[in-house]
């Protein structure tokens, strides 16, 4: 392993043969060093049994850091805690210690005696993270030995990979159960009577990587936690919740929303007492290619190619490197390009680079995790799956290809570098889009701005309805529960609506689930838009290649699309939307594909409005109709458009939330927008606004959609719509409405600062535009936005 302990942050670049001059013609735009952090330690609490202390010492833990001690003490006293500190700061110990101590005989504060055989539920967003924690807990349990009334700690996983006979043992004997939201939803809560022993003794619920529960997924988890608390109360329990999280804007408020408690009941522990080596962060701009895009706009080199080049150079120099990118296809492409480049230098190095993403089979995932942990792999290109706390130490460098969506994720990813105590390096490679361009030119927006809050909305009726049905099937909903908005945030009206639809029956004792032969929990789609997962099948031998959610199916698995899995490319031959099957065949094309969509929008209800002079900003409910109408084949490495193919797929409708801006033609004219430029000005402003909204929310531009029109039938004016791409909304458009002035100002700054003449992907072009980025008027869009801001100020 090669390290760079030199205090000069440019040393690693020089050793790896990378450009080391900030500014100028090279790619390096900014260097920032996160300083080293010294350890601050604390004594073991007196209530921790000697056997537990001895077990931790045997595992290499001699003492506690201050944040671990603070969190553990509060949890032991019965207070909910969110421990929001840096990557590799030992959050697991801080959240697990009170539960392990209670199992081994510690008396919780305020209790006359310890509850017999205390149980602990550990919840993680992924099976991989739970498997990693299980391995560590099993070793710790062996070191602790047969302590306390339970005869020791008995950890076990309970997930989709657990065999039936093992499941019975877990229910009857395990006192630390590690699972994920999916299994809690369909396997544990609906079968709570089989878990009566466990729930009667449940004292602690540990939620790992709590910051990852945001948006629609987070709203589902918030309702799942309310169902869990309800079942626990039925068996006489009132568990204490412990959250482990990356840093966030207001962790106590976010965690309180997640678990369904009042904010004052949650303690946020944010002062990190663990040591960390310095990390040098390089903001990296892709160079321009010789090709041009829509409207002859200049094109930068592909983000995946730039990241693959960095991965190759770093691996060649001996640096263990992890490259993050948001998309599955991106991870596969980076790994493939890097392997091909390394094969020209050293065939052995080429075999030590791989991709990691969701959609792999269980055996593939575990093998990759082990290979990276043990150092058999030198380079890995990953989706954010490895952003989470899987124990992978000894990494020298991290490449972050494109903005990961939130500052929390950004700092979580770069925190992977330097985990072995040596100086680390992190590269942020800016993509060719407005948000990345803004951050490249405004590094203070990364390093000197508060980390975002996790946006969740458990009152969203589209999310809440199936959880209400699941709750009613688990236990009838009592009349007093219907009035408890803390338990059921959507309110009593949703119960009445579900009763009217025939899904619930009203009885004197409350509401009962009306379908005797159905599983209500199976109607809850935690990780998708409500449609079931699609299975990807190899047409040649019928083997299962992978899976994907329904939201991905039309854009990524339409006939003619290229689907990539483990470095292998497949051509989609058929998309069976009725049976949820994608039929593919192996190919090796020199191109990738990108879908095009068209969209129309109808205003259903205006919930809020504010006037800015002659302009107005609105928020409300809309119905969006969209269709995938075609796709482009684009050359690998250059993104040159090779062909444009039509598609005939059925349209889909979406009822969601939106914010929209209306601007009368007279005001646009006064701002310098001539009539023939109005469509292009609106269209360009819409694209740039969508690109910048994730800066203010915890969303992603792919979670957000937009429509602009020179005369909308519902508003009667030129209008820009920005909407949430999820049924019922996800809180992003509402956040945009609340922060409209800041959002529009940031958008104007980005367009103004882009050096292109008439628009490019770094300012007003969109990678998912269904109209081939036409018409677009960059300068007119800037006049429009500046006119809005002047009206607001006036």
Residue positions per predicted region:
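Helicase-associated low-complexity/disordered flanking segments
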Residues: 1-69, 80
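Conserved strand-helix element at the start of the C-terminal RecA-like helicase core
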Residues: 119-130, 311-341
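Conserved helix/coil segment N-terminal to the catalytic DExD/H
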Residues: 160-201, 371
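SF2 helicase catalytic motif II
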Residues: 181-188, 192-235
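Post-DEXD/H (motif II) to motif III coupling segment of the RecA-like Helicase ATP-binding lobe
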Residues: 211-272
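Conserved interdomain linker/interface between the two RecA-like ATPase lobes of SF2 helicase motors
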Residues: 252-259, 264-327
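Conserved SF2 helicase motif VI
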Residues: 405-427
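Extended Lys/Arg-rich polyanion-binding regions
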Residues: 423-426, 432-449, 457, 462-478, ...
